């Protein structure tokens, strides 16, 4: 077959060329390919070199769009030993390291050509050579490197010519690495009948892209296909790095493994991969990929890209208010001020202002002025009055005024303030009220003097008041140690203007106040009088004087014996009278401590909230620890108030013990400090093996910087360790480094619990314990709660997360941040006024009415039992809090966890009685669990013990009698599921009583409300069946 025949073939199939051209044109626009040569786009002659001249022929035809189609063909199949070469022009490699050659060609089947079996071939060879510049017409085939032998996937025959069928082959070969500036390609024909329709040379790149708001430039992949090129991106305009953005360029030009990202800066939001400025009236306060927000009420902005909206005139934003909070204004004045006065106290009450300014942090201050008859002439009251609880920063809308003076006009100005009052230049609004104290009350006493003093006693007298307005009934004397002012005081009474006070400390200064009581009431307390008791020396001198008198009297002779005898009898009688009087006064004397009566022999538990200064409660109930005895080792977590670290505590004369140190974070508010110290004050009153033990507190002294910077960096950030330059390491001998000047941290030091919180511990060791081991854990928790209940405390946040486990698997109750002390009434409950409640663990009455009691703790204990037996599963699983509340109201209770004995689940159900008086006491729970531990075989037989527990509701309520399962479903309005139950084989009540929530889902009950109703009814059915079986009946 000659060249003319091939040319004729191509011309016959010319109508395919436009289609071919269009297809190759699409490929040339692949985004990750850079084309170096494409013969289909060359408008002029190619000018490729052929060797020999009569080998390859160039054929150029025009397609229907008048674009040239360059083709090279050769078909010297009749002659043997063909060696025809076709070489391209010099091709610049650009930035490529590896190139790809795409060839489109047709090839004639040798079997379709007669008489050429020995000379016809069906392959050709592809070669290349690298060069830094063009060789011109020089061509040395021996210098070329072979790339591959190219064979056709399809070849055409004479029949294809007749049927006008074009069989076009496409082959791609890769070449590399290319190190010089350019290269040549060469095609060797060795006796084939072939037409080279097009040649395209390209290399691959990872194209420019934007990912996660980061731009990545064009990148050339490495020659080695197994390695990736790491590319760091740059953030788009108005964006900033959150994590370093990276992509990896693969060998095929694909971007892989995106890491990091950029986020839109403040004032900008992400829209379709770029950051756009917030429109006027909108803002974005923090960098991130969230949308701009509309300005909150009473604020606006009129420019773009705003990070915070500005408050309108008269409105303000406090320093700690988030930008999303509406601007607020100071409140109006309080309303409806009223007073109530008696002999000793003046009570001021008022209503909240009509306009709170849009804030909840409302406080009040009371300013006192003394006015004469002319109310325009007033002066400050000074420090004579006492305000309970205080006169500034009041949260409640009332205050008690003490120590006021009779016959005085007092004007009280009550100011209302909130968090932005200090930002306003306008005067604080107030409401004033004038109170004239009672003219009938007696005036104050005159001067007070010390008649004599001993080591333990003081004899005092004073001037009666100038105006008593009636007979003086008695005097009330209040006294306390000067160094312990307002911490502890005692009082006594005397009918005369004198008193002998006994039971005092030697060489101690006491403060005395006296007020008068008449039929018309009390006077105010007098000014302070200071007197000091004697020391041992003065008492010895007095005793020596008495001895001298006795000796002189004895020498006087027998004649004075009768007189002396009479003298001693009279003296003895007087002393007996004085002692009797002192004893009577001692009985009447009442010792007061922070407003609580102290009775001998009865331990009283004091609510820390009754202390105006929380540090006073801490120092009374908790031991102050010298911080040099503490060594901090590492951070183990974060609590509500700050970080929690582990460390060691050195006790004098004992070995070091591991401890946990709870810290108060920097920038805390007074309320946070008070709550933080309150927890320590509560823990310090507990002493039980199942209650977390308080080792002590650090509130006074400076703290050594040992390991703090390395392990508790927030100390340094919070400014607790001002002046510390660098922490000193502990020496090899274990000695502590020199002291470093430091600030005043606040810490609570408790025993260290190696296994952490119970819920995490159980999840980590799922299935590792026997049932008796789990019951032992539950018994420890119940024992700790019994101790708290006996003391009159309500925990309010009992959950597995608040139970800590030590290395011996002893469980201890912790986290007393929500605890409240109860009054003497054993059925008393604590009512909260706000705050978050852990819905899944809290009793219904506590959720609905905020009424907490030991019975609500029993409900929470039932949830803890369920957590323990399920190895730390989340109660009520993925149900929302609202669904939990509704489900409990409808009677739903948690089913028994897998493998949970019936007796334990029945105890849970008993704890979850809706009527709180029917729930078991912790005493009964401990007793029941003790039975199980002593007799493990009773785990499946002690259900009856639960049903007869004290405070049990008694017999199970009457349950309707159903003949069929269908009747039962109809009674709970679930009759539509009869066929589901029948088809699944649940045809008897015995089978139904064993159904779980998974069984109910499996038979096709999809709606959650229907699932809850059926499960609740099954639980009631199960309890009823168990009860009648215990009574000897059968279902």
Curated annotation (Swiss-Prot):
The active site is at 797 (proton acceptor). Residues 630-943 form the Protein kinase domain. CDD domains: EphR_LBD_A6 (cd10484), FN3 (cd00063), PTKc_EphR_A (cd05066), SAM_EPH-A6 (cd09547). It holds the Pfam family SAM_1. Disulfide bonds: none annotated. Residues 330-440, 441-536 form the Fibronectin type-III domain. Gene3D superfamilies: ephrin a2 ectodomain (2.60.40.1770), Galactose-binding domain-like (2.60.120.260), Immunoglobulins (2.60.40.10), Phosphorylase Kinase, domain 1 (3.30.200.20), Transcription Factor, Ets-1 (1.10.150.50), Transferase(Phosphotransferase) domain 1 (1.10.510.10), Tumor Necrosis Factor Receptor, subunit A, domain 2 (2.10.50.10). Residues 571-1035 are cytoplasmic. Its EC number is 2.7.10.1. GO terms for molecular function: ATP binding; ephrin receptor activity. Glycans are attached at residues 342, 396, 409. Receptor tyrosine kinase which binds promiscuously GPI-anchored ephrin-A family ligands residing on adjacent cells, leading to contact-dependent bidirectional signaling into neighboring cells. The signaling pathway downstream of the receptor is referred to as forward signaling while the signaling pathway downstream of the ephrin ligand is referred to as reverse signaling. Heterotetramer upon binding of the ligand. The heterotetramer is composed of an ephrin dimer and a receptor dimer. Oligomerization is probably required to induce biological responses. Interacts (via SAM domain) with ANKS1A (via SAM domain). This is Ephrin type-A receptor 6. It comes from Mus musculus.
């Amino acid at each position: 077959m000659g060249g003319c025949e091939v040319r004729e073939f191509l011309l016959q199939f010319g109508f395919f060329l436009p289609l071919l051209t269009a297809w190759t044109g699409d490929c040339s626009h692949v985004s990750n390919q850079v084309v170096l040569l494409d013969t289909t786009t060359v408008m002029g002659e190619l000018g490729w070199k052929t060797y020999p001249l009569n080998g390859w022929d160039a054929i150029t035809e025009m397609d229907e769009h008048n674009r040239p189609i360059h083709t090279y063909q050769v078909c010297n199949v009749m002659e043997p030993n063909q060696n025809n070469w076709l070489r391209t022009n010099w091709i610049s490699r650009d930035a490529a390291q590896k190139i790809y050659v795409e060839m489109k060609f047709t090839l004639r089947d040798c079997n379709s050509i007669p008489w050429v079996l020995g000379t016809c071939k069906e392959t050709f060879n592809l070669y290349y050579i690298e060069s830094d510049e063009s060789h011109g017409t020089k061509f040395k085939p021996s210098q070329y490197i072979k790339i591959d032998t190219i064979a056709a996937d399809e070849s055409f025959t004479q029949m294809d010519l007749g049927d006008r069928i074009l069989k076009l082959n496409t082959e791609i070969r890769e070449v590399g690495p290319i190190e010089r500036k350019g290269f040549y390609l060469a095609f060797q024909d060795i006796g084939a009948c072939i037409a080279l329709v097009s040649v395209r040379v390209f290399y691959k790149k990872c194209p420019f892209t934007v990912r996660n708001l980061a731009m990545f430039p064009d990148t050339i992949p490495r020659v080695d296909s197994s390695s990736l090129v790491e590319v760091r991106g740059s953030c788009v305009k108005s964006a900033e790095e959150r994590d370093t953005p990276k992509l990896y360029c693969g060998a095929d030009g694909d971007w892989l493994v995106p890491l990091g990202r950029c986020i839109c800066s403040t004032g900008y939001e992400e829209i379709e991969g770029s950051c756009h400025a917030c429109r006027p009236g909108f803002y974005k306060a923090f960098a991130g990929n969230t949308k701009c927000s509309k300005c909150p009420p009473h604020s606006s902005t009129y420019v773009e890209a705003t990070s915070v909206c500005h408050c309108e005139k008269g409105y303000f934003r406090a320093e700690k208010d988030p930008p999303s909070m509406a601007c607020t204004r100071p409140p109006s004045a309080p309303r409806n001020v009223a007073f109530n006065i008696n002999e000793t106290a003046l009570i001021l009450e008022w209503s909240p202002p009509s306009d709170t300014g849009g804030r909840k942090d409302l406080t009040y201050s009371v300013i006192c002025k003394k006015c004469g008859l002319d109310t325009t002439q007033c002066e400050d009251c000074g420090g004579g009055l006492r305000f309970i609880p205080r006169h500034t920063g009041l949260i409640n809308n009332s205050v008690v005024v003490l120590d006021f003076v009779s016959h005085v006009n007092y004007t009280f100005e009550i100011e209302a303030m909130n968090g932005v009052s200090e930002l306003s230049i306008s005067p604080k609004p107030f409401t004033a009220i004038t109170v004239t104290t009672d003219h009938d009350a007696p005036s104050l006493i005159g001067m007070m003097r010390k008649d004599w003093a001993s080591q333990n006693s003081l004899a005092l007298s004073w001037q009666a008041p100038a105006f008593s307005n009636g007979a003086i009934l008695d005097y009330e004397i209040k006294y306390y140690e000067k160094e312990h002012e307002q911490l502890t005081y005692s009082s006594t009474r005397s009918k005369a203007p004198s008193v002998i006070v006994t039971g005092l400390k030697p060489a101690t200064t006491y403060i005395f106040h006296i007020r008068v009581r008449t039929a018309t009431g009390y006077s105010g307390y007098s000014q302070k009088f200071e007197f000091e008791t004697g020391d041992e020396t003065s008492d010895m001198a007095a005793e020596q004087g008495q001895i001298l008198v006795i000796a002189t009297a004895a020498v006087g002779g027998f004649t004075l014996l009768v007189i002396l005898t009479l003298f001693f009898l009279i003296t003895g009688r007087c002393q007996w009278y004085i002692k009797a009087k002192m004893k009577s006064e001692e009985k009447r004397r009442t010792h007061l401590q922070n407003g609580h009566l102290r009775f001998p022999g009865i331990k009283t538990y004091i609510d820390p909230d009754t202390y105006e200064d929380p540090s006073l409660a801490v120092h009374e109930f908790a031991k102050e620890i010298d911080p040099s005895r503490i060594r901090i080792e590492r951070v183990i977590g974060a609590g509500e108030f700050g970080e929690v670290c582990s460390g060691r505590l050195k006790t004098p004369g004992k070995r070091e013990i591991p401890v946990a140190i709870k810290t108060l974070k920097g920038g805390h508010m007074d309320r946070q400090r008070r709550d933080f110290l309150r927890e320590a004050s509560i823990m310090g009153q507990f002493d039980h093996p199942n209650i977390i033990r308080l080792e002590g507190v650090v509130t006074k002294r400076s703290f050594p910087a040992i390991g703090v910077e390395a392990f508790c960096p927030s100390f340094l950030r919070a400014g607790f360790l001002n002046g510390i330059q660098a922490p000193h390491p502990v020496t090899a001998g274990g000695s502590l480094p020199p002291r470093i000047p430091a600030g005043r941290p606040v810490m609570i030091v408790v025993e260290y619990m190696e296994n952490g919180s119970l819920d995490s511990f159980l999840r980590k060791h799922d299935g590792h314990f026997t049932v008796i081991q789990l019951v032992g854990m539950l018994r420890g928790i119940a024992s700790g709660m019994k101790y708290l209940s006996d003391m009159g405390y309500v925990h309010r946040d009992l959950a597995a997360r608040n139970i800590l486990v030590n290395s011996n698997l002893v469980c201890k109750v912790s986290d007393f941040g929500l605890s409240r002390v109860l009054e003497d009434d054993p059925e008393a409950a604590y009512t909260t006024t706000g705050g978050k409640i852990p819905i899944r663990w809290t009793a219904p009455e506590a959720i609905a009415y905020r009424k907490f009691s030991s019975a609500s703790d029993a409900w929470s204990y039932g949830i803890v039992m369920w957590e323990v037996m399920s190895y730390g599963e989340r109660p009520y699983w993925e149900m929302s809090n609202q669904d939990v509340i509704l489900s409990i109201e409808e009677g739903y209770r948690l089913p028994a966890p897998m493998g949970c004995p019936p007796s334990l689940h029945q105890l849970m159900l008993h704890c979850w009685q809706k009527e709180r008086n029917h729930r078991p006491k912790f005493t009964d729970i401990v007793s029941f669990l003790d039975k199980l531990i002593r007799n493990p075989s009773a785990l499946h037989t002690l259900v009856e013990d639960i049903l007869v527990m004290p405070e049990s509701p008694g017999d199970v309520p009457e349950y309707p009698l159903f003949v069929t399962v269908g009747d039962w479903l109809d009674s709970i309005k679930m009759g539509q599921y009869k066929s589901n139950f029948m088809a699944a084989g649940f045809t008897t009540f015995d089978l139904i009583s064993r159904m779980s929530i998974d069984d109910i889902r499996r038979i096709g009950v999809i709606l959650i409300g229907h699932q809850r109703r059926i499960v609740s009814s099954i639980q009631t059915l199960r309890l009823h069946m168990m009860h009648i079986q215990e009574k000897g009946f059968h279902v």
